Amino acid sequence: MNRRVAVYILVALTVLMLVDGKYGLFDTTAPYRHLVRIEEAKGAGLDPGTPSAEKSGLLEEMLGPGQVLRLNNALGHINVTGTPGAERAQLNYNIYVYAANEAVGEAYLDRLDIRVVQSETGLDVRLVEPAKRPEEVHQVRLDVSASIPSEARVEIYNNMGTVRVENVSGPSIINNAFGDTTIKEVGGKLNVDAAYTNLDVTRVRGDLVVKGSYGSSSLRNIDGNVTVESDFRTTSLTDVKGDIEAEISFGGIAANEIDGDIKTKGAYTIIGARNVTGSAIAHTEYGTVRFQGIGKDMIVDARRSDVTIILEQVPDHRISLETENGSLALQGTLSQLQPQTGEAGKKMVNAVVGAGTHSIEVRNVQGNVSVKHPPHP
């Protein structure tokens, strides 16, 4: 085994173990748990020590319904809360300078300022620094705690730090890295890019788009459609009213209580979907797929993966299963369906159970397929 292949396998096992342990979907990685230890990101790089100089202030500006508070920040913590009926934005800020000594810090602090530009679209807030930072100044941090009208929107671009946003309108945009990101109660569409973070989103009354690699995402109570793009990340979705479309690699996705359809594409991933009213589609390689309680059609196109489908309703399906160089098992009330053996190690089942209202289509190469319908008393 060459070194590159060994690295890929180790990374895949690491991510599968994290997903399996976090969501309890499967027990596929139990023999490997002693090999790797995983710790989630907790705001790396945000503790440079005691600041050499600091100052604080308060800014107040008019901000109307539908207007946007736009924050651009390199390093710091952002907290924005919407207040019903408010007409102004209030921003409490703290600037910290980390320097070689207090004198250098104080001198540089005097050259810093908060710039607020008001326009028809809203407010643009950012820290203004000299073009060149002295070598004796190590870091500058800006923390902002803001209260805005709940009918206003936000656009936050934060390179490093924790971000917390609650009770604002949409469409809103939140980009953050290297710090936990918590978002609650967004009255409209939300677009999030949160790399190297642990992301928690609750209650979005619109569509949700989530991008970002490394860390974890918890997405709950979403009224619209959800789009997920990530690498090396675990994502859980609960109570989604619309459709889900996810493209992931070296990670996993667990979806539960979904009113629409779910479509996933991934590699080196664990894909799990349970209690889905619509259809479920998965395209994957080097991973695991588990569908349970899917209301409509199920389609799986897999390579070197294990596929498990559990029917909770009375079977009423057109069933087409095929695996090459793997096992094919039908259990419970479906055990009377016997796989046929073909060329090149293929095993196949083609049958209609009930009226065939819905379909189950699975194609797998060098992987196992299991379809079961537990008998009910």
Residue ranges and their predicted role:
Residues M1-A194, N198-P377:
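Intrinsically disordered, low-complexity terminal regions
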